Amino acid sequence: MTKNTSTPTIIATKTFLTAPPFQTFEKPPRILIIGAGSRGTSYAHFINTCSNALIVSICEPNPHKNATFGSKYIWGADGVPAFGQSFTSWEDWVDYERDRRESERTGKGLTGRSGFKAVVVDAVFVCVLDELHEKVVTGIVNGLGGGVSICVEKPLSVSLNSCISMYNALKGAGNDGGEKSGDEKKEKERIFGICHVLRYSPHNMLLRQLVLEEEKIGEVLSVEHVEPVGWWHFSHSYVR
């Protein structure tokens, strides 16, 4: 590796504080939020603020949170949820989605909903407690065999075995050994991501530039990994 021999300075040559432009999709992705707590609500807010993506459905067992979230982000303050826009559990949505796909394949309407326009989901945001991530992710993947992108809030799970379980489920999704058509292959090629947002925080991006890209600080000799949990997490919710 060629060392940087220029005069040391820690002045950034890039600007990381500028907000990204509003993202406009030619075909806006349709999003399901699982969990209408503070994290799920935060995602919904920034989805609406930063892009033209559409929040089309919510899974939340608490009736008040479900209604509050839906009226703000989906069916409007004076509206009521249409069939497919509100669920009390992710399992109910999986059942609905399985029925929707079958009706699409056969050309028949949804069970008991003749003529109803189905709510279609392209991506799912998993915003439940850490220890529930595995159950939700594997339940969706095994129940549907793929077909939707999934974003999981950090951490991925609470144990290595749990993470491996999700990996194995995702790896095997749709791999039935048969030949796939172009459309079928495209349907299976979805994204699975973990929302490690601090990788993109301005201070971390600046540090990465100074240490790795420009080598202005010096070599990394050791790393102390900490999780600075803010005090507000202690006042209203669980703490890892």
Locate each region found by the language model.
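Beta-strand-loop-alpha-helix segment that lines the small-molecule cofactor/substrate pocket
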Residues: 119-123, 129-199
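Glycine-rich, N-terminal phosphate-binding loop of Rossmann-like dinucleotide-binding domains
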Residues: 127-128, 227
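Conserved acidic residues
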Residues: 56, 84, 122, 221
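A structured beta-alpha segment of the ubiquitous adenosine-cofactor-binding alpha/beta core
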Residues: 83-120
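N-terminal Rossmann-like dinucleotide-binding module
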Residues: 2-81, 114
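Receiver (REC) domain switch-region micro-motif
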Residues: 58, 124, 150, 223
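Predominantly a Rossmann-like dinucleotide-binding segment in NAD(P)-dependent oxidoreductases
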Residues: 190, 198-240
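Acidic-histidine catalytic/liganding microenvironments
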Residues: 50, 73, 173, 201, ...
